[in-house]
């Protein structure tokens, strides 16, 4: 059993079932990407793994125990979540934002400790934001802003980092900036990263494992080489693709060549 897992997880909004009886395990010390078509439920799974959504049935397990039976503060010491398009109060600086990550470790009305200061400084250094710590968030580029939010998540001091579409609304250079940072945090600092991604080639390039979702169930899971198959692209995305190897690192890549025939007929 991994540090974070789901057992027969069913998730719903009111009476509409979105995820139906899913089992999954997050590989510790690796980068995992949740992929699938729009509306398939991948972000819903991430919310449940982060304890932001209670299951209709089944269990999310954190360190082998039901995550919903653990105190919120204890969960926040083990797992950090960065939602899609997070918002902060106007005028907040990068450093002030980063200190919010220390809240799970503080008692009510207590002052910051030396450990808090050390963790914030480390998080800012690790994300390359130390020189920008006094800037307000609204004065940053898209990539810098996302790095600032990641520094806050790092300041929590957790081994698990969950991100919902961390590259959404960023141009390509800022997308790569964020993905390279997450790769560095995994490689150099041992963080387990779970993220929802839309770009399949980026998912294959940066993730060690992929979990694909189709109609509320896990379609397939494994390494990019295991997941990137012709049936996967046809059934999950309705695409005909040419699957090739990157000339740089031999990771699989897909080149869409058109819609599959059953979709053309519609």
UniProtKB/Swiss-Prot annotation:
It comes from Bacillus subtilis (strain 168). Keywords: ATP-binding, Cell membrane, Ion transport, Iron, Iron transport, Membrane, Nucleotide-binding, Translocase, Transport. Signal peptide: none annotated. The keyword Zinc does not apply. The complex is composed of one ATP-binding protein (YfmF), two transmembrane proteins (YfmD and YfmE) and a solute-binding protein (YfmC). It is found in: Cell membrane. GO terms for biological process: iron ion transport. Part of the ABC transporter complex YfmCDEF involved in citrate-dependent Fe(3+) import. Responsible for energy coupling to the transport system. GO terms for molecular function: ATP binding; ATP hydrolysis activity. The keyword Ion transport applies. It holds the Pfam family ABC_tran. It is a peripheral membrane protein. This is Fe(3+)-citrate import ATP-binding protein YfmF. The gene is yfmF.
